[in-house]
Amino acid sequence: MDYTLTREESKLLMELLGLPMEQYGNFPLMRKAFLQKCKIMHPDKGGDEQTAKMLISLYKKLESEVKSLNTDDGFSTEEIPTYGSAEWEQWWQTFNEDFDLFCHETFTVSDDEEEGGEKRKHSDEEEPSCSQATPPKKKKTSSAPKDMPELLRNFLSNAILSNKTLTCFLVYTTLEKSSLLYSKLSEKFKPTFISRHKLDNEGLIFLITPSKHRVSAITNFCSNLCSVSFLIVKAVIKEYSCYCALCVEPFVLVVENIPGGLNSDFFDAPQEASKNVSWKLIGEYALSIMCDDLFLLLGLYKEFAVNPSTCSKCDQKVIVDHYKYHSLHYANAMLFTDCKNQKAICQQAVDGVLAFRRVQTAQLTRKQLLAKRFEYHFNKLEQVFSAKSEVCIETYMAGVCWFECLLPEVNMKNFILQYLECVVQNVPKKRFWCFTGPVNTGKTTLAAALLDLCGGKSLNVNMPFDKLNFELGVAIDQFTVVFEDVKGQSENKNLPTGQGISNLDNLRDYLDGAVKVNLEKKHLNKKTQIFPPGIVTANEYIFPLTLKVRFCKIIKFIYQQHLFKSLKKTELLTKHRVLQSGLTLLLLLVFHCDVEDFLSELHPLVTKWRENINHEVSWSRYLEMKENVMNGLNILEKQQDSGIFTQTQDTECQQ
């Protein structure tokens, strides 16, 4: 091999391979280095082409020369005789004559050795005699405690694999390891309080964190530092009692981060506040305003902690949900602000609202549910038209005039009554209306007003079908729904395409309402119910026949320039979203319908608001606003009085 390459070529090759000359001839190592250098020196990898060529040529030359030198050392399998023959025995002896495996050494027999060396046994646990051997890993002592000291068990949680989060923990380990864990826990969790205690040769760490954690989080952090030492971590449920027990014999306090330790006030104040606050009172408030938003309820109730005598919202008397209940809940709100479980209290109150709504859905008829909704709207009118409100009845009556001009040759009063009858009767396969037409023709505006009038939710089905489950789950316990702006295929290239219509075609059981369907929300069990009726709004898309037959009525909207102009000039309607409010349609019904058309329990409210409308808006003023809509003018603009009409006419005789 020394004659395969010259001395200079050998040095150059080893230099290119990045290996010392002592490794020359170590072909496995040289080949590994060669493959690595080829990747580095390849021109495509940014290497030098000439250097790469030099490396490859030298290595190939060495490899070819070495193979040629070793050609005589091998043999062919064809030279081996048949196994078992006399020729094979002779060949086998010749083949092995250079391999002498016999050991010629002699050993002196010791007196301690047993006769027959084959009986000697070596223990697996015998320590190596060589001083350079790796020391064996220490094993955890079998005498390690399996549980917390008995004196402390009454103060600790016995839960196993619990996901509950807490702020107080007790760590039990060796005395030596407790010193390390004390410093590491202080760095990691920035505890409100931490102390280290001693029990014989064992250590305990009492830990209070500023935020809540699972027991597993503390255990996983500490176990990375305890490969040999035993470790037990448990949550503390009686914090002050546990701390006091750790400070008396047989325990010894070693160190704590707060000089003087803790007193009972540190633990008892939040507990006393949570005990004294009335959960029932908060639940009743949420039910009275029908608030199913956890964070809204939390914010509203915190506002009650302000003294009612200095509360600006109570002085203004604009928000009924505030000034009506402030004085009653002031004392309870003061205790509520000191609680650490505010979210849990509000969550229970919100759950009570959802439970009440579900009971109503299960027990009341749809006509009774609609009456409850109308009663809610009548009460809301009191708040909307309060003395300090920016809008008045005339503003909403302007919205009534705009709606009456929305669909030519259609009586809007009869239109709304037919829709109410449709959703109340809820007849299978005759439950959905479809609003279709060009862009900006009022489809969504009317659908939103009807949805607010009856109550319900708007749904988006323009998404992949496998993601619709939770979107449809929004309809749980709702009176009506609106499938808003459903997209599909259209001959109009200006309209975006979508899969909403295809998804609706696959939801026939939902639209028909003949059988119950499964609806689901996150973190809640599936609920089986009849899917609520409602409206589908869409632009000029192509509806398949299988979907058309599931609409009991299809209304085609047309673009009317005077509606667009009048709405643009009457900014008050868009600013306060008058046209999207169910209150506008309710006033339309009160204005045009007889009192007997409503349920008997609503008659006093209907009579009251008919009188209010007649007092605020005369019949002549109503006709004037309607004429402004048809002319594309500001609806609330008053024309010059000609002196012809001098008296206010009652609307009861009209229609």
Swiss-Prot record:
Its EC number is 5.6.2.4. The keyword Transmembrane does not apply. A motif (LXCXE motif) lies at residues 101-105. ATP binds at G437, P438, V439, N440, T441, G442, K443, T444. The modification Phosphoserine is found at S110. GO terms for molecular function: ATP binding; ATP hydrolysis activity; DNA replication origin binding; helicase activity; zinc ion binding. It comes from the Viruses. A zinc finger (T-ag D1-type) spans 274-366. Zn(2+) binds at C311, C314, H322, H326. Residues 12-84 form the J domain. This is Large T antigen. It comes from Squirrel monkey polyomavirus.
